[in-house]
Swiss-Prot record:
Protein name according to UniProt: Cyclin-dependent kinase 20
PANTHER family on file: CELL DIVISION PROTEIN KINASE, CYCLIN-DEPENDENT KINASE 20
Assigned EC number: 2.7.11.22
Native source organism of the sequence: Pongo abelii
Domain of life: Eukaryota
Domain Protein kinase: 4-288
Family the entry assigns: Belongs to the protein kinase superfamily. CMGC Ser/Thr protein kinase family. CDC2/CDKX subfamily.
Keyword entries, A-Z: ATP-binding, Cell cycle, Cell division, Cell projection, Cilium, Cytoplasm, Developmental protein, Kinase, Nucleotide-binding, Nucleus, Serine/threonine-protein kinase, Transferase
Major location (coarse): nucleus
A molecular function GO annotation: protein serine kinase activity
Localization: Nucleus; Cytoplasm; Cell projection, Cilium
Complex and partners: Monomer. Interacts with TBC1D32 and MAK.
Swiss-Prot/TrEMBL catalytic activity: L-seryl-[protein] + ATP = O-phospho-L-seryl-[protein] + ADP + H(+); L-threonyl-[protein] + ATP = O-phospho-L-threonyl-[protein] + ADP + H(+)
GO CC, any one term: Golgi apparatus
Length: 346
């Protein structure tokens, strides 16, 4: 740590504190993630090891945050990353209105290039969300926080935990307890992020896993084996039943979005994971080649992360234009008593 001068604190993650720092000799500005070991015998946390392994296995890519160094410090170690000024969550949070179409296209295009690169290297991120998409001073978007990333098995034989991904961006198969999954979980998250950029607020802001499923089915309709053949094989399929409900056209959910945007969004937000459009294929979608074209990164908003007041908590289920998703949770369930243990009072 002697080679760095700490300039300020950026934030705190699951396994450490992140600082803005300056290299004493070179003057380079970096982000230092300090990971403390609670007990030496516990070893390095798995999430930290996964992040290091994932980033080291991928060659430098302009859409993935660069890990510059790893070194021991006190009772732990430090990861030195390239410094990024802000993140996409800050961009959405500070936008006075939904982003312009050209801006949405630019952010989504950069995200898809990063996701395509990860998937080409057999890396599934498993926690894509706006807060993990960092923005540089030049407007460049880069994927960060690979603490949940794994090398995926193309034959689908490997078992994983389903408790990954932040709830609002968690794929339906994970909500149903799937232990075998692939890059489809990232593609669902990309769709959620795209919808949030178009809408200005999250599409599926559930407070627990059951409510999360309810938000999804209110737009996509009730899943069934006809549209999702693997549904009945999921561990939690029989634990809760939903009333039959038809899907809502995306143009009613996002009436200001272009037909091309809705077509691409609909190819991400599909129940069967293997039917979701691949990131590499999505980059060739007509959405990116119709006016307005994606904005240049230098034309994108870049809010400062440091010195910005803490945002207010999300108020809960929002009204999405003229389409309401804030109906009582019980209206979506066959047996409302099943959700009583999951409902927070007050």
């Amino acid at each position: 740590m002697d080679q760095y001068c700490i300039l300020g604190r950026i934030g705190e993650g699951a396994h450490g504190i992140v600082f803005k720092a300056k290299h004493v000799e070179t003057g380079e500005i970096v982000a230092l993630k300090k990971v403390a070991l609670r007990r030496l015998e516990d070893g390095i946390p798995n999430q930290a090891l996964r992040e290091i392994k994932a980033l080291q296995e991928m060659e430098d890519n302009q859409y993935v945050v660069q890990l510059k160094a790893v070194f021991p410090h006190s009772a732990g170690f430090v990861l030195a990353f390239e410094f990024m000024l802000s993140d996409l969550a800050e961009v959405v949070r500070h936008a006075q209105r939904p982003l312009a179409q050209a801006q949405v296209k630019s952010y989504l295009q950069m995200l898809l290039k990063g996701v395509s690169f990860c998937h080409a290297n057999n890396i599934v991120h498993r926690d894509l969300k706006p807060a993990n998409l960092l923005i540089s001073a030049s407007g460049q978007l880069k994927i960060a926080d690979f603490g949940l990333a794994r090398v995926f098995s193309p034959d689908g034989s490997r078992l994983y935990t389903h408790q990954v991904a932040t709830r609002w961006y968690r794929a339906p198969e994970l909500l149903y307890g799937a232990r075998q999954y692939d890059q489809g979980v990232d593609l669902w998250a990309v769709g959620c992020i795209m919808g949030e950029l178009l809408n200005g607020s999250p599409l599926f802001p559930g407070k627990n896993d059951i409510e999360q499923l309810c938000y999804v089915l209110r737009i996509l309709g009730t899943p069934n084996p006809q549209v999702w053949p693997e549904l009945t094989e999921l561990p939690d399929y029989n634990k809760i039943s939903f009333k039959e409900q038809a899907p809502v056209p995306l143009e009613e959910v996002l009436p200001d979005a272009s037909p091309q945007a809705l077509d691409l969004l609909g190819q991400f937000l599909l129940y069967p994971p293997r039917q979701r459009i691949a990131a590499s294929k999505a980059l060739l979608h007509q959405y990116f080649f119709t006016a307005p074209l994606p904005a240049h990164p230098s034309e994108l908003p870049i809010p400062q992360r440091l010195g910005v007041p803490a945002p207010k908590a999300h108020p809960g289920p929002p009204r999405i234009h003229d389409f309401y998703v804030d109906r009582p949770l019980e209206e979506s369930l066959l047996n409302p008593e099943l959700i009583r243990p999951f409902i927070l009072e007050g």
